[in-house]
Structure formats: structure tokens, C-alpha cells
From Swiss-Prot:
It holds the Pfam family Nop10p. This is H/ACA ribonucleoprotein complex subunit NOP10. GO terms for biological process: positive regulation of telomerase RNA localization to Cajal body; snoRNA guided rRNA pseudouridine synthesis; snRNA pseudouridine synthesis. It comes from Debaryomyces hansenii (strain ATCC 36239 / CBS 767 / BCRC 21394 / JCM 1990 / NBRC 0083 / IGC 2968). Keywords: Nucleus, Ribonucleoprotein, Ribosome biogenesis, rRNA processing.
Amino acid sequence: MHLMYTLGPDGKRVYTLNKTTSDGEITKSAHPARFSPDDKYSRQRVTLKKRFGLLPTQ
């Protein structure tokens, strides 16, 4: 089982091990994507994060 999350009514993450909530909403994975040294789009991602003022890890 993997750790999953959904956003609560206050906007904070609510963690669960289920794939769906009791309301039938699909949860999202709480784990980051795998790292690949052959990442073709890292330059574009870094540029977009700088443009919109996001942290590099978001």
C-alpha cells in the first residue's frame, strides 16, 4: 500500500492508504515522481518554476 492524500475542506492534505475517499473522490499519491538522469524537460520545468515563483521542490 502506498501513502495517498486528498485535500480537506481547509485546503490541507489529509493522508490515507485508500485509493478513494468515502465520497468516491480519487486520492493522489503522496510520493514524489521517480528521478531520471535522462530527463528531457528539466530545463523547461526549472524555467517555469522561476517564472511563477515556486520552490524548486514543488
